[in-house]
Amino acid sequence: MAFFSIFAKYLENEKMKHIFMVNTVAGKHSCLNEVKEAISRDTSFSDYEIYTPESASDNTDFIKKYLEEHPNQETRFYACGGDGTANKVASGVVGHPNASMTVLAHGSGNDYIKYYADLETFQDADKVLHGEEHRVDIMKANDRYALNATHFGLDAVVAKAMNKIRRHTIFGGKMCYPFAVVWGFLTGMRTKCTVYADGEKLNDGKICLCTVANGKYVGGSYKCAPKSKNDDGLLEVCLVKPLSRFRFPFLIKTYTEGSHLDNPKFKNLIVYRRAKQVVIEGGKNFCVSLDGEIMEAQRIVVDNMQQAIRFVAPTV
């Protein structure tokens, strides 16, 4: 049986086009050489190419154009980078039934993949190249997309800061998120906005932070949506009401563990819902983070597109 399974996978790879979208500036170092080495070791990948975009948006544009020109070609796209690269790849793949995607993790943020396995597993090219396909949800926020999470309030302040320092010599790489959190703690503890989940008003016009998620993690280690199922068509909405800086560290501890939803100490502080649609009404210069990518809009409508993405995850 093992032989036939391996042979079937070989035939699948033979007829499929494999395109590696390599973000040459993800994290602090490029993963281009690692990708080339992984492909050279695997003789089953006869039809492939490597694409290195000049800018982040080039990923999405390239994928859309390729799929429009090859509507009958079964194609798998590999997001070689972090959450931002995965976001751009997913934004190009969505709506194309002949396309699938996966992630070769190599960036400063790799939150979505933690739904399936740890970072090291998604850095193992051999495991990723021969993974199992799943149909997963993706959310549409106005005219853009998020695979993992749409988050705002303190989270958006942190994401903005993170984008500025992620490639800094000292503060970049794995340390950029903790430094960004400190900046958010000092400047972004209260945001004016109103949130609706399937028409239900969740707050009185102010929040500390809010995540709308299909994945489970944000910020590298914060388990914001421990009950999430990324294929059920429902968004996990976790809204934290304004709180003092003194109380905030106690919340963060449970937020990291993923125990915040069931902790009685924060019962009156956290609003949790599952919804198909979330509407966010903010003010001037209001922004949200879409998988770490910043979008500004005064009104944002987030709809979940159930099982609209074919995502390949390593078998663990």
Where are these regions (language model features)?
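Short acidic/glycine-rich loop or secondary-structure boundary segments that cap or lie
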Residues: 155-158, 203-205, 217-221, 245-249
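Glycine-rich phosphate/pyrophosphate-binding beta-alpha loops
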Residues: 151, 155, 211-225, 294
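ATP/nucleoside-binding phosphotransfer catalytic cores, i.e., glycine-rich phosphate-binding loops
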Residues: 197-199, 229, 239-316
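Gly/Ser/Thr-rich active-site loops/lids in small-molecule metabolic enzymes
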Residues: 167-176, 226-246
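Catalytic core of DAGKc-family lipid kinases
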Residues: 19-21, 27, 53, 95-208
